[in-house]
Swiss-Prot record:
<dbReference type="GO" id="GO:0044550">
    <property type="term" value="P:secondary metabolite biosynthetic process"/>
</dbReference>
<feature type="active site" description="Acyl-thioester intermediate">
    <location>
        <position position="129"/>
    </location>
</feature>
<dbReference type="InterPro" id="IPR016039">
    <property type="entry name" value="Thiolase-like"/>
</dbReference>
<keyword id="KW-0808">Transferase</keyword>
<comment type="function">
    <text>Required for the biosynthesis of the quorum-sensing signaling molecules 2-heptyl-4(1H)-quinolone (HHQ) and 2-heptyl-3-hydroxy-4(1H)-quinolone (Pseudomonas quinolone signal or PQS), which are important for biofilm formation and virulence. The PqsC/PqsB complex catalyzes the condensation of 2-aminobenzoylacetate (2-ABA) and octanoyl-CoA to form HHQ. First, PqsC acquires an octanoyl group from octanoyl-CoA and forms an octanoyl-PqsC intermediate.</text>
</comment>
<dbReference type="InterPro" id="IPR013751">
    <property type="entry name" value="ACP_syn_III_N"/>
</dbReference>
<dbReference type="Pfam" id="PF08545">
    <property type="entry name" value="ACP_syn_III"/>
</dbReference>
<dbReference type="InterPro" id="IPR013747">
    <property type="entry name" value="ACP_syn_III_C"/>
</dbReference>
<protein>
    <recommendedName>
        <fullName>2-heptyl-4(1H)-quinolone synthase subunit PqsC</fullName>
        <ecNumber>2.3.1.230</ecNumber>
    </recommendedName>
</protein>
<dbReference type="GO" id="GO:0005737">
    <property type="term" value="C:cytoplasm"/>
</dbReference>
<feature type="active site">
    <location>
        <position position="269"/>
    </location>
</feature>
<keyword id="KW-0963">Cytoplasm</keyword>
<keyword id="KW-0012">Acyltransferase</keyword>
<dbReference type="GO" id="GO:0004315">
    <property type="term" value="F:3-oxoacyl-[acyl-carrier-protein] synthase activity"/>
</dbReference>
<comment type="subunit">
    <text>Forms a tight complex with PqsB.</text>
</comment>
<comment type="similarity">
    <text>Belongs to the thiolase-like superfamily. FabH family.</text>
</comment>
<dbReference type="GO" id="GO:0006633">
    <property type="term" value="P:fatty acid biosynthetic process"/>
</dbReference>
Length: 348
């Protein structure tokens, strides 16, 4: 069985960042200081389609930069795995220039064509906030079995397209995209050591996308697709999300034959400080072994984990030879964790 290397990673965020006091939130009620402190978001970015920003254009920019920086020829990529939580695709680049909003085709086929990945099998997957981990596992499985040597993993989130800017939850989320390259490892210096996932649909309705009116509608408001957080979602999430991610981490570590003391760094999804800290405490991670990134970026759904990973690599908190755990939760609800032995990872 072949080893797997996380070879390169990059992210692309919107050009403009919105502070908590921005007029875009003028119609949102009850934005108290305690709200901001609890959720820990100070600023977040939204794609601006007027300036050509969307879930497709920015991921093309990021993927082209990664391929160029890693000296990877497009026709050498064997597989492309894409995730986008929004069901609405807004752009298809030069491939389908006249196609605008659509439900399908999804991203992988169109992006593969745009990037010139002439040999790549395109695949779309979905696990919301944990999609990056799912995609890494799928890619690693193909490489480990010898069915692929190079796999491009993409997560792109245009969540602002679904936000209800009369609801407090609109202040939490943000747009962004991430691209990673997985390759066959040449030695034992790097590998995906173990993965663990489980799910529980008991609280499926807590966070969903559904057709409805805005929470505080005007006379001209019409139903449309909005991200929707259950009215008591904060308390419901606190009843099961803090404990389930550590369960996934312990299972992954057990599969790898390791304990938490063997891990150098932890990379968590970034939904809220209280959840990240609960996950860290649940696995025995020290404060210096993980970080919070949602303050400057907002909650970028599936992009939060790769962005936090990239930040740790860029800041030197994660180094070649380190063993790391990546973990998070996904609406629905799913819980995932992975243990990686990292080699040199190109950040571009």
């Amino acid at each position: 069985m072949h080893k797997v290397k996380l070879a390169a990673i990059t992210c692309e965020l919107p050009a403009r960042s919105y502070e908590n006091d921005d007029p875009v939130f003028a119609a949102v009620p009850d934005l108290s200081e305690s709200w901001w402190q609890f959720w820990g978001v100070n600023r977040r970015g939204y794609f601006d389609p007027r300036n050509g920003e969307n879930e497709f254009s920015l991921v093309v920019r990021a993927a082209e930069r990664l391929l160029r920086s890693s000296d990877t020829a497009p026709d050498s990529v064997d597989m492309l795995i894409c995730s986008a939580s929004s069901p609405i695709m807004t752009d298809a680049g030069d491939v389908l220039p006249d196609l605008r909003g659509r439900l399908y085709p999804r991203m992988a086929n169109v992006l593969s064509k745009q990037l010139g990945l002439s040999r790549a099998l395109p695949l779309d997957s979905q696990m919301e906030c944990a999609s990056f981990l799912l995609n890494l596992r799928l890619a690693a499985s193909m490489i480990r079995q010898g069915k692929a040597e190079k796999v491009l993993v993409v997560c792109s989130e245009y969540i602002s397209n679904l936000l209800d800017f009369t609801s407090r939850t609109s202040t939490l989320f943000a747009d962004g995209c991430a691209v990673a390259l997985l390759t066959r490892g040449d030695d034992d210096s790097c590998d995906l050591l173990a993965s663990a996932e489980h799910s529980d649909a008991t609280f499926y309705e807590v966070a969903t996308g559904r057709w409805r009116l805005p929470e505080n509608p005007t006379g001209e408001a019409k139903p449309r697709l909005y991200f929707s957080l259950f009215s008591d979602g904060q308390n419901k999430m606190a009843s099961f999300v803090p404990t389930n991610v550590p369960i996934a981490m312990r299972r992954a570590l057990e599969k790898a034959g390791l304990g938490s003391d063997d891990i150098d760094y932890f990379v968590f999804h970034q939904p809220a400080p209280f959840l990240v800290k609960a996950w860290a405490e649940g696995i025995g991670a020290r404060p210096e072994q993980y970080q919070l990134t949602m303050g400057d970026t907002g909650v970028m759904i599936s992009v939060s984990i790769p962005y936090t990973l990239m930040t740790g690599l860029r800041e030197g908190k994660i180094r070649p030879g380190d063993r790391i755990v990546m973990a998070g939760a996904a609406t629905g609800w799913g819980f995932a964790a992975q243990v990686w032995q990292l080699g040199e990872v190109l950040v571009c």
